[in-house]
């Protein structure tokens, strides 16, 4: 939301738009990006499922106000590109990345997911889900719900640990805390 004013200055002080003034409000929230999952079978059904899972993860995570989630357009722009953890952190500002893959054999389906901490360049959570390939929407809903429950907890734990070990740079803030 931006507020538009006709006056660009008040008493000689240049005004900034609302977005610029409040750009640091959400800086405390962990920033998460999702990489479109790899379809290891290269079939249309698998592609449909992996895209659906990532879209639903973006939707569900964006409902959690304590987490900042990259847009669908940004996330799907990562498809097929080879970024390093350092570039995700430096170029995009992500604290965490969710990635994964899907593969199938006959009527069996395996979805692998991992949550990586970009600050330490390490996987902090991963899991695999095996299902019978019946109702793709039911599978998608079940998997997304399980993933959300796990990764949100891991993000909170990691963020709390990170906040606990990072000393304040502002002594006035520290004195008020005491």
Question: Where is each model-derived feature located?
Answer:
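Catalytic-center loop of serine/cysteine hydrolases
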Residues: 1-20, 43, 53-178
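Short beta-strand segments enriched in small/hydrophobic residues
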Residues: 30-40
């Amino acid at each position: 939301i931006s507020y538009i004013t006709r006056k660009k200055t008040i008493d000689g002080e240049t005004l900034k738009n609302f977005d610029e003034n409040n750009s640091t409000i959400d800086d405390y929230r962990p920033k998460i990006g999702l990489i479109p999952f790899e379809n290891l079978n290269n079939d249309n059904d698998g592609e449909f499922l992996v895209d659906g899972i990532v879209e639903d993860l973006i939707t569900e995570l964006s409902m959690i106000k304590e987490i900042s989630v990259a847009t669908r357009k940004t996330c799907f722009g990562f498809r097929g590109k080879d970024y390093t953890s350092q570039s995700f952190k430096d170029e995009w500002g992500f604290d965490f990345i969710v990635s994964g893959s899907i593969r199938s054999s006959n009527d069996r389906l395996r979805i692998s997911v991992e949550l990586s901490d970009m600050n330490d360049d390490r996987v902090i959570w991963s899991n695999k889900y095996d299902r019978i390939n019946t109702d793709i929407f039911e599978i998608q809903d079940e998997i997304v719900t399980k993933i959300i429950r796990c990764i949100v907890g891991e993000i909170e734990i990691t963020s709390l640990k990170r906040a606990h070990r990072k000393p304040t740079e502002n002594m006035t803030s520290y004195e008020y805390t005491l």
